[in-house]
């Protein structure tokens, strides 16, 4: 049997898995071409794939009872009465709020790998005034080597205008999408209000590869050597870099770890399993990380898919951690949640921040395998559910994991990564050391941040919609 590498992209959303499964796996294609409708052949193919792989395949209606004349689908579309793919989903968008389709398989696979055409930054959009008219973009993340970073943009910047246009409630969702080159008008906090600083940055969209191993450092506090890692997406191409960082942590004697997953919507399950193996206390390759539940058809045909995934032998495993601190947001999803759930049976996992997204299921990428290719659709249906070594998988609701310490990430502008007054990081340090850290540390002792309790319109949103994924997924062997 050929090795089947399961990858989990946790999203979001994106779910990718560790290389642990064996069996030859290819999408079946029993589609009968018809000429009754321009959509019927593609929809018939979509149905056959869903009947084979979909986690809730037993709940699908008979193909003859579906409307094969519907438009096949649209990425992120919610109108199940109009689009065939979404009409098949189980109780969409409630029970299955995760399966999706993209009209271009290349765009789909690129997004799962963190590749996009974008400026390369993530922002939170918040109303700045009581009338809820003016909006500010607070930059939370800038991709390394992206056009935004090269232009000088950084976490903590405030964007008030784009190409001279004030951001407001009517245009905040469209200004970035409608321009290839943008001049960003920056703001500052002055006398309690966010006003123009007179500074601008200019950038042009380009193909960007997200480097998810974004920031790390070691902080010494008494007898505590605290490793801090900002990890934004589970992408297997960066596994070697991840191992290297943990090697540095181990060499420096790290005995506490803060894993910042607040911007991590998912990724390869293989990378989630790798980081679990680097973190777990008393690493034992006979111990189970997680087990995957597939539909009855797949479980019968490919028995090894339900074989539990076990920890891998990692030379840079930290070894002696008694606990793990995870920083979270509502966008912490799928593969990120898999790490939390997988490690809980073996060590204390302390969650600081907000409720996580709530995604305990994973998907696969399916494309037309015929020669020549008949259509460019890419399907990303949910095909499995994960549970940990104790059989636990109870976080798959919209409440996700409940934090041990609920800390709102609503102090703007955002503090730099590793700043000890940054709210979530600050709380983790306080729990670790038992010492209270001042709410803010500035040179002139004046407040340079402001808490905003007004409505958040977009939380940690990429400037490219294709990177909104919160998913875990399996890929077919090459």
Can you annotate each of these PLM segments?
Residues 38-42, 47-136, 181, 187-213:
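Extended, small/polar residue-biased N-terminal targeting/export presequences
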Residues 125-127, 141-143, 164-166, 188, ...:
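A mature extracytoplasmic/lumenal domain signature
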Residues 46, 121, 148, 156-159, ...:
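Terminal peptide-recognition signature
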């Amino acid at each position: 049997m050929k090795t089947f590498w399961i990858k989990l992209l946790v999203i979001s959303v994106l779910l990718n898995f560790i290389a642990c499964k064996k069996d030859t796996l290819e999408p079946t294609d029993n589609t009968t071409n018809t000429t009754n409708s321009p959509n019927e052949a593609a929809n018939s193919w979509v149905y056959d794939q869903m009947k084979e792989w979909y986690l809730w395949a037993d709940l699908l209606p008979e193909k003859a009872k579906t409307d094969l004349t519907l438009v096949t689908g649209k990425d992120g579309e919610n109108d199940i009465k109009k689009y065939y793919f979404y009409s098949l989903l189980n109780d969409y968008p409630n029970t299955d709020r995760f399966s999706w389709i993209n009209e271009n398989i290349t765009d789909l696979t690129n997004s799962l790998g963190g590749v996009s055409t974008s400026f390369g930054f993530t922002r939170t959009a918040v109303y700045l005034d009581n009338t809820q008219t003016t909006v500010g973009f607070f930059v939370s993340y800038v991709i390394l080597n992206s056009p935004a970073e090269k232009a000088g943009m950084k976490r903590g910047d405030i964007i008030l205008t784009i190409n001279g246009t004030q951001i407001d409630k009517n245009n905040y969702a469209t200004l970035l999408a409608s321009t290839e080159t943008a001049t960003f008008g920056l703001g500052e906090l002055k006398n309690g209000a966010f006003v123009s600083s007179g500074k601008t940055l200019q950038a042009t969209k380009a193909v960007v590869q997200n480097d998810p191993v974004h920031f790390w450092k070691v902080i010494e506090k008494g007898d505590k050597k605290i490793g801090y890692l900002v990890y934004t997406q589970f992408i297997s191409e960066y596994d070697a870099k991840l191992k290297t960082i943990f090697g540095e942590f181990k060499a420096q004697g790290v005995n506490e770890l803060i894993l910042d997953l607040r911007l991590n919507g998912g990724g390869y399950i293989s990378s989630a399993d790798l980081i679990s193996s680097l973190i777990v206390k008393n690493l034992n390759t006979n111990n189970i990380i997680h087990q995957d539940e597939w539909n009855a058809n797949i479980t019968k045909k490919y028995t090894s898919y339900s074989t539990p995934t076990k920890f891998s032998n990692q030379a840079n495993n930290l070894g002696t951690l008694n606990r793990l601190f995870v920083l979270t947001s509502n966008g912490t999803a799928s593969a990120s949640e898999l790490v939390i759930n997988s490690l809980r049976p073996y060590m204390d996992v302390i969650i600081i921040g907000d409720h996580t997204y709530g995604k305990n299921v994973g998907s696969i990428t399916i494309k037309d395998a015929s020669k020549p290719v008949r259509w460019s659709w890419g399907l990303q249906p949910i095909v499995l559910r994960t549970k940990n070594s104790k059989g636990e998988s109870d976080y798959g609701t919209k409440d996700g994991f409940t934090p041990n310490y609920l800390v709102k990430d609503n102090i703007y502008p955002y503090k730099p990564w590793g700043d000890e007054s940054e709210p979530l990081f600050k709380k983790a340090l306080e729990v670790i050391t038992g010492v209270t850290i001042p709410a803010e540390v500035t040179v002139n002792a004046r407040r340079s941040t402001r808490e905003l309790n007004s409505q958040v319109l977009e939380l940690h949103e990429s400037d490219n919609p294709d990177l909104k994924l919160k998913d875990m997924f399996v890929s077919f062997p090459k």
